[in-house]
Each structure stands twice: as structure tokens, then as C-alpha cells.
């Protein structure tokens, strides 16, 4: 990220987060359609959604909760969420070798890295250059399972995709909220 106005840094980070979230949501739907029987789908009201590792992070869970946090806190939560996916996402291309949706899966890792760099650039700007090194959360999510003939592996991947989608939605929401707070745009729909 070259030196640029803070508003541009936020705009770029929001766009990257939106793009990744849409890609995650599309992939989740494609995976569900292709591999998960109707009665086992999370979208069914009676089924239990996957437990996401990110639920153990003390990140805000709703918009009201997020509005109580400082921009720096929201950036830290966003960074932790993004970093928790850097390792597992590298296995996505093996899981979705023949998927049209994930034809760009090799680029998901790069897109996540770009978003990570964007968040770190925002943190440096807001901390006036006193940015501490990134803290990579351990443990992160497990790797995706490349065995798609095994029902347990399918359900594990399905759960991971669900968490990936949820976490990217959180990051997108936090970034939009900060951008709206700082620049008071009239079209601030979160």
C-alpha cells in the first residue's frame, strides 16, 4: 500500500473485504449445492450451524456492540480474523479442483494477504507509525480436507466455509463501520 489518504485506505480495505465476503458466500452456496444433502444444510432452520473458532475471540458480535469499540480495536479484531484464515485458505484450491466458483481459489490467499496488508496500513496510519508487529493467532482454523468422498470431511469443509463466510462478513462490517464513523458518508448502510 503506497502512501495515500486515509479515506482511500479505508475505501480500498472495504472493497477488498466485500469482494472476499462475496466470494466466500458464493463458494459456500456452491459447495452446499454440490455436496450437502438438503436435510444436512446449515440453511435449514432446525440444523445446527458449525462452531467457528472465531467465536472464542472477544470480537463484537453485533453492530451495536461494534459501535462501542474504538477503530483500533476493530482493526485488531479484523486483523486477527483475516490472519486466522491465511493457512487454511491455501488448501482451498485442492478441495475445489473442478469447481467453477473456485476457479480463482489460488488467488483467495493473495486477496486475504492484500486485505491483511490493507488493515496493517490502516493500523500504522492510526497509530502514527508506532504499529507493533502483527500477532498471528494460534491455533488457527484447521486445514480443509481434500477427501470429498468422506462424509465427515464434507461436513468439516462445509463448516469451515460457513465460518469463513461469517468471519469475512464481520471484517467487512467492522471496516464499513469505521469508514462511516470517520468520513460520515450519507450512504452508510452496514
From Swiss-Prot:
<protein>
    <recommendedName>
        <fullName>Somatotropin</fullName>
    </recommendedName>
</protein>
<comment type="function">
    <text>Growth hormone plays an important role in growth control and involved in the regulation of several anabolic processes.</text>
</comment>
<dbReference type="InterPro" id="IPR001400">
    <property type="entry name" value="Somatotropin/Prolactin"/>
</dbReference>
<dbReference type="InterPro" id="IPR034975">
    <property type="entry name" value="Somatotropin"/>
</dbReference>
<dbReference type="GO" id="GO:0046872">
    <property type="term" value="F:metal ion binding"/>
</dbReference>
<dbReference type="GO" id="GO:0045927">
    <property type="term" value="P:positive regulation of growth"/>
</dbReference>
<feature type="binding site">
    <location>
        <position position="172"/>
    </location>
    <ligand>
        <name>Zn(2+)</name>
    </ligand>
</feature>
<dbReference type="Pfam" id="PF00103">
    <property type="entry name" value="Hormone_1"/>
</dbReference>
<keyword id="KW-0479">Metal-binding</keyword>
<comment type="similarity">
    <text>Belongs to the somatotropin/prolactin family.</text>
</comment>
<dbReference type="GO" id="GO:0005131">
    <property type="term" value="F:growth hormone receptor binding"/>
</dbReference>
<keyword id="KW-0964">Secreted</keyword>
<feature type="disulfide bond">
    <location>
        <begin position="52"/>
        <end position="163"/>
    </location>
</feature>
<dbReference type="InterPro" id="IPR018116">
    <property type="entry name" value="Somatotropin_CS"/>
</dbReference>
<dbReference type="GO" id="GO:0005179">
    <property type="term" value="F:hormone activity"/>
</dbReference>
<dbReference type="GO" id="GO:0005615">
    <property type="term" value="C:extracellular space"/>
</dbReference>
<feature type="binding site">
    <location>
        <position position="19"/>
    </location>
    <ligand>
        <name>Zn(2+)</name>
    </ligand>
</feature>
<feature type="disulfide bond">
    <location>
        <begin position="180"/>
        <end position="188"/>
    </location>
</feature>
<keyword id="KW-0862">Zinc</keyword>
<keyword id="KW-0372">Hormone</keyword>
<keyword id="KW-1015">Disulfide bond</keyword>
<dbReference type="GO" id="GO:0048513">
    <property type="term" value="P:animal organ development"/>
</dbReference>
<dbReference type="GO" id="GO:0008083">
    <property type="term" value="F:growth factor activity"/>
</dbReference>
<dbReference type="GO" id="GO:0046427">
    <property type="term" value="P:positive regulation of receptor signaling pathway via JAK-STAT"/>
</dbReference>
<dbReference type="GO" id="GO:0060396">
    <property type="term" value="P:growth hormone receptor signaling pathway"/>
</dbReference>
<dbReference type="GO" id="GO:0031667">
    <property type="term" value="P:response to nutrient levels"/>
</dbReference>
<dbReference type="InterPro" id="IPR009079">
    <property type="entry name" value="4_helix_cytokine-like_core"/>
</dbReference>
Amino acid at each position: 500500500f503506497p502512501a495515500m489518504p486515509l479515506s482511500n485506505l479505508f475505501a480500498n480495505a472495504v472493497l477488498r473485504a466485500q469482494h472476499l465476503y462475496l466470494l466466500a458466500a458464493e463458494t459456500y452456496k456452491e459447495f452446499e449445492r454440490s455436496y450437502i444433502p438438503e436435510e444436512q444444510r446449515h440453511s435449514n432452520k432446525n440444523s445446527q450451524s458449525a462452531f467457528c473458532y472465531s467465536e472464542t475471540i472477544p470480537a463484537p458480535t453485533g453492530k451495536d456492540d461494534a459501535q462501542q469499540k474504538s477503530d483500533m480495536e476493530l482493526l485488531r479484531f479484523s486483523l486477527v480474523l483475516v490472519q486466522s484464515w491465511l493457512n487454511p485458505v491455501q488448501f482451498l484450491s485442492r478441495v475445489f479442483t473442478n469447481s467453477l466458483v473456485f476457479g480463482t481459489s489460488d488467488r483467495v490467499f493473495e486477496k486475504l494477504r492484500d486485505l491483511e496488508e490493507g488493515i496493517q496500513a490502516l493500523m500504522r496510519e492510526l497509530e502514527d507509525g508506532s504499529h507493533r508487529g502483527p500477532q498471528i493467532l494460534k491455533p488457527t482454523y484447521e486445514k480443509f480436507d481434500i477427501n470429498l468422498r468422506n462424509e465427515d470431511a464434507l461436513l468439516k469443509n462445509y463448516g469451515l466455509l460457513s465460518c469463513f463466510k461469517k468471519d469475512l462478513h464481520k471484517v467487512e462490517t467492522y471496516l464499513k463501520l469505521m469508514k462511516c464513523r470517520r468520513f460520515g458518508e450519507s450512504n452508510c448502510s452496514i
